[in-house]
């Protein structure tokens, strides 16, 4: 389990782009993570997406999954951004959206390590609300030294 203070040690993102509120399960040996993002009407993106029918933008759901995957990657390497390592989100495959995410939802973020080759990491990810899958796909990250 990781609270927001520890999450901030592993992710360089800050408001309004830090999209992981808590890690509830982290299994480095099993190479998987489960975290969540509480989706509030106060999120800045709801002002324009869409004012009369607020929906969390799909690209931000993908980014939230990528941030959870990044935490897993850092933990697997036993490094932090302060150590001079960063993960860049470089792509996605097989991404599918199944239902909208709205204010008041708790977005569960799950990532499982698939492979790493020449500093390119691939994770299988999904996002859920009320145990229903809202998004799934593969996240691709590049590990770089700063």
Curated annotation (Swiss-Prot):
GO terms for cellular component: cytoplasm; membrane
Main location group: cytoplasm
GO biological process terms held by the UniProt record: fatty acid biosynthetic process; lipid A biosynthetic process
Top EC group: lyase
Cited Pfam families: FabA
This enzyme's EC code(s): 4.2.1.59
Alphabetically ordered keywords of this record: Cytoplasm, Lipid A biosynthesis, Lipid biosynthesis, Lipid metabolism, Lyase
Subcellular location: Cytoplasm
Reaction(s) catalysed (UniProt annotation): a (3R)-hydroxyacyl-[ACP] = a (2E)-enoyl-[ACP] + H2O
A molecular function GO annotation: (3R)-hydroxyacyl-[acyl-carrier-protein] dehydratase activity
Source organism superkingdom: Bacteria
CDD domains: FabZ (cd01288)
Function, as annotated: Involved in unsaturated fatty acids biosynthesis. Catalyzes the dehydration of short chain beta-hydroxyacyl-ACPs and long chain saturated and unsaturated beta-hydroxyacyl-ACPs.
Family as reported in the entry's similarity comment: Belongs to the thioester dehydratase family. FabZ subfamily.
Name of the molecule in the record: 3-hydroxyacyl-[acyl-carrier-protein] dehydratase FabZ
Native species: Azotobacter vinelandii (strain DJ / ATCC BAA-1303)
